[in-house]
């Protein structure tokens, strides 16, 4: 751990192990346990049983003293630092990056800046690449009415409530629809447990470092 950066190592659960380790890079607003919710409901568990050596770059809530962390900090510092730690711990030079959501954005930027780096394979999922095709997100953050400087200068770090509200505006009926699905499966104990796990994660959003939020808004959403 180093400030908001957390690095975990999961041991393989197979006799034959792939040589190249996998580094999972989480979204900066999401807790990493979404990929390891419970036995039988875990992407990490699946990879371990397949024989992969799995590491995860996860995030702790940034403190008030970390409000200065910006886009470059994540791309040029945290990701290469974790890759170096994975290399040292595994004894391997090559690394596979598998990145989720904004973790994929950061990893894509790292890859573009380090084309001859140690990443052998790169996979990203639910990752926005074309920022001009962000639809409602682009409308919500339009510079004509969204003053990101005022927001960050006033609050420092951006609280999770702001992040959750933005996603709720994108899908205003999603919570209601989720409750309907829960009701339809009320007598299925496993379905209820799985729903509660996912719902807990969905409400366990992280705040974002102020300068990082300012950077992503201006350099990605606006530029």
Show the residue positions of the predicted features:
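Short, surface-exposed "cap/lid" segments of acyl-processing enzymes
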Residues: 1-63
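A structural signal for isolated positions on well-ordered beta-strands in alpha/beta enzyme cores
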Residues: 55, 96, 121-123
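Conserved catalytic-core motifs of eukaryotic protein kinase domains, centered on the activation segment
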Residues: 66-68, 135
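Alpha/beta-hydrolase active-site loop
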Residues: 68-89
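Alpha/beta-hydrolase-fold enzymes
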Residues: 88, 92, 107-211
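Gly/Ala-rich beta-loop-alpha elbow adjacent to hydrolase catalytic centers
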Residues: 98-107
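Active-site nucleophile elbow and catalytic-triad environment of alpha/beta-hydrolase enzymes
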Residues: 219-223
